[in-house]
């Protein structure tokens, strides 16, 4: 090599050495000062969490993209854009107890499906995470609707008033506490005592009143309305009383148009031959019917009302009248609906029921004995411990299935757990002797329900 070539060689070597040194210094700096990176990550996660409304979120190391240095060992070179794009998909959480409402599973009830030759599916509404019933959807939608209209303001000390036989009150009480409201519930004193006990534990004020017709000012719904009107007179703190009015508020059926109906449609792929449900306020059956028929054009899908004994809705659907004028609610000063079943069955037409009444194709009347026997059957054959309204739904689903071709798909609801019906409905089942070992082994569903004429 000539002397004249030495500067060129030296320059190349120097450039290579400088480049390598730069890499080593950069990596070494990062290894020598890991705390700087940790501080940056903590600060970045706090800022990102606040922007997403999720406070206290820490991104686990497992979710960070990192590379290693052969010389200096592990070096974290975070791909910040990658972490940002995956921050929500890396975790599966919901915000608050209201995030546990909806998207309940659709369960095939094997014993009923095998007995009828149809596929009987039940939407497990008892798995809603606030109050454990479909009333969670209604309560949440009524509260959100009131907030949007300025009728409820979080943190102002407002109180939600409602007249209910239990489930709606439990849902309202749970969500009220979660959203910063108080809750005042009026209910008949012939409802299962565990419902009012649960309401007390949820922090609600509970008034149990004697059963009365809707024409009486002492009817539990009218009392709740009056308590809401009296609120500002007895509270000088600037708070207001909001009467939820589940029977007449259209936010009730709209909750099912927005959530329950679409979920059923998605879970069945739109392939269902009948939907069966009871009606108290009427919001569930009306809302689901409106979605399936009016929005998805499933006009061939039969919507069937499941009605307990003592209720007038069966006659309204079948014959166009509730009952004779001498039996009109309010004519006789006593409770008209005489049944062990709670939550469904009524002798008046509510705004919610009327909104979907013309979409209901048929009705099935279910006796208390049939409901009790179905509840026990579901425990013994499917491990489903249900309340009274669920039992009525399932009896009606069986009757409906037997009127359809084999292989038809019938959807109904598992409304709530039997835990809320121990002192009344399930006590009556025990008194009937249905929990005896000999009775528990019944294998003929139709004989058990007194429906032998329906057997194929």
From Swiss-Prot:
What keywords does the record list, in alphabetical order? Membrane, Mitochondrion, Mitochondrion outer membrane, Transferase, Transmembrane, Transmembrane helix
- Any matching Pfam family: PALP
What membrane topology term does the record carry?
Answer: Single-pass membrane protein
Q: Name one GO molecular function term.
A: cysteine synthase activity
The prosthetic group or cofactor this protein requires is:
pyridoxal 5'-phosphate
Could you state one GO biological process linked to this protein? cysteine biosynthetic process from serine
S-adenosyl-L-methionine as UniProt keyword = no
> Per the UniProt record, which EC number(s) apply here?
2.5.1.47
Keyword Mitochondrion appears in the UniProt entry: yes
Q: What does this protein do?
A: Putative cysteine synthase that catalyzes the conversion of O-acetyl-L-serine (OAS) into cysteine, the last step in the cysteine biosynthesis pathway. However, in contrast to cysteine synthase cys-17, this CS-like protein may not function in cysteine biosynthesis.
Q: Please state what the protein is called.
A: Cysteine synthase 2
Per the UniProt record, the source organism is: Neurospora crassa (strain ATCC 24698 / 74-OR23-1A / CBS 708.71 / DSM 1257 / FGSC 987)
């Amino acid at each position: 090599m000539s002397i004249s070539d030495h500067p060129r060689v030296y320059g190349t070597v120097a450039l290579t050495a400088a480049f390598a040194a730069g890499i080593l210094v950069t990596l070494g700096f990062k290894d020598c000062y890991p705390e700087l990176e940790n501080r940056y990550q903590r600060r970045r996660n706090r800022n990102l969490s606040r922007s997403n409304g999720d406070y206290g979120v820490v991104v686990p190391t497992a979710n960070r993209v990192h590379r290693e240095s052969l010389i200096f060992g592990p070096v974290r070179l975070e791909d910040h854009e990658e972490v940002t794009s995956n921050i929500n998909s890396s975790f599966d959480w919901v915000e608050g107890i209201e995030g546990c409402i909806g998207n309940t599973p659709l369960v095939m009830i094997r014993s009923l499906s095998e007995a009828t030759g149809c596929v009987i599916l039940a939407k497990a509404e008892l798995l809603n995470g606030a109050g454990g019933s479909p009333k969670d959807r209604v309560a949440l939608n009524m509260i959100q609707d009131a907030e949007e209209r300025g009728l409820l303001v979080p943190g102002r000390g407002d109180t939600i008033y409602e007249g209910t036989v239990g489930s709606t009150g439990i849902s309202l009480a749970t969500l009220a506490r979660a959203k910063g409201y108080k809750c005042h519930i009026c209910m008949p004193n012939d409802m299962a005592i565990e419902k009012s006990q649960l309401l007390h534990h949820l922090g609600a004020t509970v008034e149990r009143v004697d059963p009365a017709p809707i024409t009486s000012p002492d009817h539990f719904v009218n009392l709740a309305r009056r308590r809401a009107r009296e609120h500002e007179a007895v509270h000088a703190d600037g708070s207001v009383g909001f009467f939820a009015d589940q029977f007449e508020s259209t936010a009730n059926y709209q909750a099912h148009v927005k959530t329950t109906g679409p979920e059923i449609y998605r879970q069945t792929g739109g392939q269902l031959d009948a939907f069966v449900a009871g009606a108290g306020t009427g919001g569930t059956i009306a809302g689901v019917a409106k979605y399936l028929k009016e929005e998805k054009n499933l006009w061939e899908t039969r919507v069937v009302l499941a009605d307990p004994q003592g209720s007038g809705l069966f006659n309204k659907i079948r014959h166009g009248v509730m009952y004779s004028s001498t039996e009109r609610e309010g004519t006789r000063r006593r409770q008209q609906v005489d049944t062990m079943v709670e939550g469904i069955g009524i002798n008046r037409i509510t705004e919610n029921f009327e909104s979907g009444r013309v979409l209901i194709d048929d009705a099935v009347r279910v006796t208390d004995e049939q409901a009790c026997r179905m509840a026990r059957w579901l425990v013994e054959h499917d491990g489903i411990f249900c309340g009274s309204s669920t039992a009525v739904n399932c009896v009606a689903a069986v009757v409906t299935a037997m009127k359809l071709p084999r292989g038809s798909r019938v959807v109904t609801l598992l409304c709530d757990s039997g835990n809320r019906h121990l002192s009344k409905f399930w006590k009556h089942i025990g008194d009937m002797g249905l929990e005896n070992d000999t009775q528990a082994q019944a294998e003929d569903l139709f004989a058990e329900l007194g429906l032998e004429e329906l057997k194929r």
